[in-house]
Curated annotation (Swiss-Prot):
It is found in: Cytoplasm, Cell cortex; Cytoplasm, Cytoskeleton, Spindle; Chromosome, Centromere, Kinetochore; Cytoplasm, Cytoskeleton, Microtubule organizing center, Centrosome. It comes from Caenorhabditis elegans. Residues 162-180 have a biased composition (Polar residues). It comes from the Eukaryota. Residues 161-199, 736-758, 779-821 are annotated as: Disordered. Essential component of the spindle apparatus required for spindle positioning and chromosome movement. Acts to recruit or anchor gpr-1/gpr-2 complex to the spindle and cortex. Also involved, directly or indirectly, in cytokinesis and in the coupling of DNA replication, centrosome duplication and mitotic division. The gene is lin-5. Keywords: Cell cycle, Cell division, Centromere, Chromosome, Coiled coil, Cytoplasm, Cytoskeleton, Kinetochore, Mitosis. One of its GO terms (molecular function) is dynein complex binding. One of its GO terms (biological process) is nuclear migration. Interacts with gpr-1; gpr-1 forms a complex with gpr-2 and GDP-bound goa-1. Residues 181-199 have a biased composition (Low complexity). Residues 211-634 form a coiled coil. This is Spindle apparatus protein lin-5.
Length: 821
C-alpha cells in the first residue's frame, strides 16, 4: 500500500509553513524528496541535532535516525530505513517526518500548537489529518505495542477510490427474499449460560425441600471451610510474622554484605588506582631514562661537532700562520728592497759628492766667469724658482708618501694587534665555551650556533683583514713603484740640473739646495727603513708570541680533552648507575605489581565468596519459602490429628497407637504394676528431654490430613511415634514453644521453652562435655552440631556410617520391663 495523498499534502504544507517562518527563510518544496536538501538544516536545528549541514541525503536521514533513537520514541525506530528514505521512498520519508512531528509534540508542544493554530487560522495547513495522526499515536501508546505504528500514513480504500476516480457501482439482481435476517431458536437451552455441573433434568426433578437441604448442607460445608480457612489464616499469619522477621534479618545481613562489598570495591578501586599510578610512574621513569639517553647522544654529537670545529680552527690557524709566514717573507723582500734602495742611495750620494767636488773645481774655474754670467742670473733665478717650486712639490709628495707609509704601517700594526686580540679573544671564548659545555650540556646547541656565527664572522673579519693587508701590500708595492718612478724622475731631473749647471754657473746654488733636499729625503728614507726594520722586528716578536700562544693553546686543548675524557667517563658511570637504578625500579615495580595483583585476586576471591554467600542466602530464602508451603501442609495435618486426639476417647487412641513408645498402650496391655507416685518418682530421676518436633525447622512432610494419601507406611499414626520426629540435638534445641514434652511432676502440662544458643562459650562446652560423659548422644554429629563446629569429623555422616556403632540407649520403658520380669 502506498502513502495517503492527504498525509503527504498536509506534511508538505506544514514544512513549507515552518520554512516561511524560519530564520533564515528556506525555499518551498513540492515533494518530500526535496526535504533533506532545502529543509534539512531547519529540521536538524528544531530537533537540536549536533550536525546541521548535510551534503547528502544519507547523512541527513542517518543523523535524524540517531537523534530519534536517543529520545522516548526509540521503540519505533526498528521500522525506519534511512537508506530507503535517502533514495526517495515516500513512505519512509513520511515515517521520518511523522516521528519528527511526534518529537515536536512531546518536547516542544507549545511551539507546535501555536504553529498549527496559526496555520489552520490562515488555511495554509490541513490540520485534521495531522490531528488524526496524533490521535493514532496516542492509541499506540495506550496499547503498548509499536507494530504497524505507521498504519495511519497508508492509503485507505476511500483514498484509492478517490485516486482512481469516483463512479457509481453496478446494480445487482438480488431478490429481496434472499436477504432475510436469520432469527434465533424458539427457546434457548438452559445450559447456554449456566455454570452448574448437574443436568437440567435433575434440576427440574428436585423438590423444594431437597433444594433447601442441599443449600443447608452447602452452607455447613462452606462454614466449616471458612472456619478451617480462618485457622489456616491464623497459622499462616504466624508463619508470615516469623518469615518476615527472618526476612528482615536476612535483609539486614544482605545490607551488611552489600556495605562490605561496597567497601571492598572501594579498596579494589584504590588498589587499581595505585597500580595505575605506579604504571604512570614507571612510564615517567622510562621517559626520563629515554631523555637522558637522548641528551647523552646529543652531548656526544655536540662534542664531536666541537672537536670538528676545533680541528677546523686548527686548520685555520695553520693557514693564518702560513699567511703570516708569507707576510714575513714579503717583509723580508721589502727589507731587501729597502737595503738595495739604501745602497743605491749611498752610491748616488757618493756620485753626488764626486760631482760636488767636480763642481767645486768647476766653480773655482768659473768664478772668473761670474761677472759675465750676471746677466744670465735672472733667467737662472726664474729657473731656480721653478725648480724650487718643483722641489717643494716633490718634498710635499715625499712627505705625503712618508705619511702614507706611516699610516699603512700603523694600519698593519693595528690589524696585527686586532688579529692578536681576536686570537686571544677567540681562545678565551673557546675556553669559556668548553667550560660552559662541560658544565651544562643542555645549552650546547645554542652555544654551538653562537660559536658558529661568531666563528663565521671572525672568518669573515680575518678574510677581510687578510684582503686589506694584501691590498695594503699591493698599495705599498705600488707606492714603491711610484717612489722608484719618482726616484727615476729625480735622477732625470738631477741630470737635467747637471746639464743646466754645466750650461751655467748660476745654477750651482740651486743644485746645492737640490742636493740638500735629496739628503733630507735620503735621511727620511733611512728613517723609514729603520721604522720598517722595527716593524719587522715587532712582527717577528708577534710571530714568536703567536707560536707560544699556539703551544699554550695546544697544551690547554690537551688538558681540556683530558678533562672532557674524565667527565665523559664520569657521565658513563652515572649512566650505568642510572640504568642499574632503572633495572632495580623495574624489578621493584614488577614486585609491587605482582603484590597488588595478588591482593586484587584475594579481594576478588573475597568478593566471590560474598557473592556466593548472597546466592546461598537467596537459596535459603527459596528453601524457607518451600518450608512455608510444607509448614502449611503440616499445620493442616497437625490440626486434623489434634482434633482426632481431642475428640476420640482413650481406647480409640489406644487402638490407633502402634508405637512401642506409647505409654497408654503399654499400661493397657500389662496393667498397672506400679502406682502413679512410684512412676512419677522414677520419671523424676531421668533428665527431661523433649520429644516434640520443631515444625518450623523440619523440611520433610511427616504426614497428610485425613482423606489424603499418606507418604508414610500405615503403621505410623501416633503423634508420639519415634519415627515421626528427627532425633537431632540441633532440632531438639530449637523447638517451638507449642511442642509437647514428657516432663517431671513439677512441670507436667507445661511446654518447654526452646533452647536458642547465643554462641559457643567455655561454660557451654563444659556443660556439653559433662552431659555427654554421663549420657552419650545418640548421634555423633549432635555434639559437633550443637557446638557449631562443622569441620569436626563427627559432623560428617560418612564418618558416622563407617565408624563403630554404639548400643542404643535404654528407653524409659526398660524400667517397666525389668520390674515386670
Amino acid at each position: 500500500m502506498s502513502v495517503s495523498t492527504s498525509v503527504v499534502k498536509s506534511m508538505l504544507q506544514l514544512t513549507n509553513y515552518f520554512g516561511s517562518n524560519f530564520t533564515p527563510k528556506t525555499e518551498t518544496i513540492s515533494s518530500l524528496a526535496e526535504l533533506w536538501e532545502r529543509h534539512g538544516s531547519m529540521i536538524a536545528s528544531m530537533m537540536s541535532c549536533d550536525t546541521r549541514e548535510f551534503g547528502t541525503a544519507d547523512k541527513f536521514y542517518e543523523v535524524i535516525f540517531r537523534k530519534i533513537a536517543t529520545t522516548s520514541l526509540s521503540f519505533m525506530t526498528d521500522s525506519l530505513e534511512p537508506k530507503l528514505a535517502a533514495s526517495g521512498d515516500s513512505l519512509e520519508i513520511c515515517k521520518f517526518y511523522a516521528l519528527f512531528l511526534e518529537y515536536m509534540r512531546k518536547d516542544h508542544s507549545g511551539m507546535l500548537t501555536r504553529a498549527l493554530e496559526q496555520a489552520s487560522s490562515e488555511n495554509r495547513v490541513d490540520t485534521a489529518v495531522l490531528l488524526d495522526m496524533f490521535l493514532f499515536f496516542d492509541n499506540v501508546y495506550s496499547e503498548s505495542t509499536a507494530d504497524d505504528w505507521w498504519a495511519c500514513l497508508r492509503r485507505d480504500d476511500e483514498d484509492q477510490e478517490a485516486s482512481s476516480g469516483f463512479r457509481t457501482p453496478k446494480r445487482n439482481n438480488y431478490s429481496l427474499t434472499s436477504l432475510q435476517t436469520p432469527t434465533a431458536t424458539a427457546r434457548r437451552l438452559r445450559t447456554a449460560s449456566s455454570t452448574a455441573r448437574r443436568s437440567p433434568i435433575a434440576e427440574a426433578v428436585d423438590s423444594p425441600t431437597m433444594k433447601f437441604m442441599r443449600s443447608e448442607r452447602e452452607l455447613k460445608q462452606s462454614k466449616a471451610r471458612i472456619f478451617g480457612l480462618e485457622q489456616m489464616l491464623g497459622d499462616l499469619e504466624d508463619d508470615k510474622t516469623k518469615l518476615s522477621a527472618e526476612n528482615r534479618t536476612l535483609k539486614l545481613s544482605n545490607s551488611d554484605l552489600k556495605s562490605d562489598i561496597a567497601k571492598l570495591k572501594g579498596i579494589a578501586e584504590e588498589a587499581q588506582f595505585r597500580a595505575e599510578e605506579l604504571s604512570c610512574d614507571l612510564e615517567a621513569k622510562k621517559d626520563e631514562v629515554h631523555n637522558i639517553l637522548q641528551q647523552l647522544n646529543e652531548s656526544r654529537m655536540t662534542l664531536r661537532s666541537e672537536q670538528r670545529s676545533l680541528e677546523e680552527a686548527d686548520i685555520k690557524k695553520e693557514n693564518l700562520t702560513a699567511k703570516l709566514k708569507t707576510v714575513t717573507e714579503d717583509n723580508g723582500k721589502l727589507m731587501k728592497q729597502a737595503r738595495e734602495l739604501r745602497d743605491l742611495n749611498d752610491y748616488e750620494f757618493a756620485r753626488f759628492r764626486q760631482q760636488e767636488q767636480e763642481l767645486t773645481e768647476t766653480l773655482r774655474a768659473t768664478q772668473d766667469q761670474m761677472a759675465d754670467l750676471q746677466e744670465q742670473l735672472t733667467g737662472v733665478e726664474k729657473i731656480r724658482a721653478s725648480l724650487k717650486s718643483e722641489n717643494e712639490s716633490l718634498s710635499a709628495s715625499v712627505e705625503e708618501l712618508s705619511v702614507a707609509s706611516l699610516r699603512n704601517k700603523q694600519d698593519a700594526d693595528n690589524s696585527k694587534t686586532m688579529l692578536s686580540e681576536e686570537l686571544a679573544r677567540f681562545e678565551e671564548t673557546v675556553d669559556k665555551l668548553r667550560q660552559e659545555k662541560l658544565e651544562a650540556l643542555s645549552m650546547a646547541n645554542s652555544r654551538i650556533d653562537a660559536l658558529r656565527l661568531e666563528h663565521s664572522e671572525r672568518e669573515k673579519m680575518m678574510k677581510s683583514t687578510n684582503a686589506r693587508l694584501q691590498a695594503d701590500l699591493d698599495e705599498e708595492r705600488n707606492e714603491k713603484k711610484r717612489l722608484m718612478n719618482l726616484w727615476n724622475e729625480l735622477n732625470e731631473k738631477s741630470l737635467n740640473v747637471d746639464k743646466a749647471v754645466h750650461k751655467s754657473n748660476e745654477e750651482f746654488q740651486s743644485m746645492g739646495s737640490c742636493l740638500q733636499n735629496a739628503k733630507r729625503q735620503i735621511e727620511q728614507l733611512e728613517v723609514a727603513c729603520k721604522s720598517k726594520d722595527d716593524i719587522i722586528k715587532f712582527q717577528e716578536e708577534q710571530n714568536k708570541r703567536a707560536a707560544n700562544l699556539i703551544k699554550n693553546e695546544k697544551a690547554i686543548r690537551d688538558q681540556a680533552s683530558a678533562q672532557f675524557a674524565e667527565k665523559l667517563a664520569i657521565l658513563k658511570n652515572s649512566l650505568a648507575e642510572k640504568e642499574n637504578e632503572t633495572v632495580t625500579l623495574k624489578e621493584n615495580f614488577a614486585s609491587v605489581v605482582m603484590k597488588h595483583k595478588a591482593e586484587l585476586e584475594e579481594k576478588e576471591l573475597f568478593l566471590q565468596s560474598r557473592v556466593d554467600l548472597i546466592q546461598r542466602l537467596e537459596h535459603e530464602v527459596a528453601d524457607l519459602r518451600e518450608k512455608e508451603s510444607a509448614e502449611i501442609k503440616k499445620s493442616t495435618w497437625m490440626g486434623e490429628r489434634i482434633k482426632i486426639f481431642q475428640q476420640a476417647p482413650m481406647r480409640g487412641s489406644r487402638i490407633r497407637c502402634g508405637s512401642p513408645d506409647s505409654l497408654p498402650d503399654f499400661l493397657a496391655d500389662n496393667g498397672p504394676t506400679i502406682t502413679e507416685e512410684e512412676l512419677r518418682a522414677q520419671l523424676a530421676t531421668f533428665p527431661r528431654k523433649s520429644i516434640a518436633p520443631s515444625v518450623d525447622d523440619n523440611e520433610f512432610d511427616k504426614g497428610t490430613p485425613i482423606g489424603f494419601k499418606s507418604n508414610m507406611y500405615d503403621g505410623r499414626e501416633s503423634i508420639c511415634s519415634l519415627d515421626f520426629f528427627d532425633r537431632s540435638s540441633l532440632q531438639r534445641s530449637s523447638m517451638r514453644s507449642e511442642s509437647i514434652q514428657l516432663a517431671s511432676p513439677s512441670s507436667a502440662g507445661e511446654f518447654k521453652q526452646p533452647f536458642t544458643p547465643s554462641g559457643v562459650t567455655k561454660e557451654r562446652v563444659g556443660v556439653l562435655t559433662a552431659r555427654n560423659e554421663k549420657v552419650k548422644p545418640h548421634l555423633k554429629c549432635s555434639y559437633a552440631s550443637e557446638v557449631g563446629s562443622t569441620n569436626s569429623p563427627s559432623a560428617d555422616e560418612e564418618n558416622i556410617k563407617k565408624s563403630k556403632k554404639k548400643n542404643r540407649r535404654d528407653s524409659i520403658f526398660s524400667a517397666f520391663s525389668s520390674k515386670k520380669q
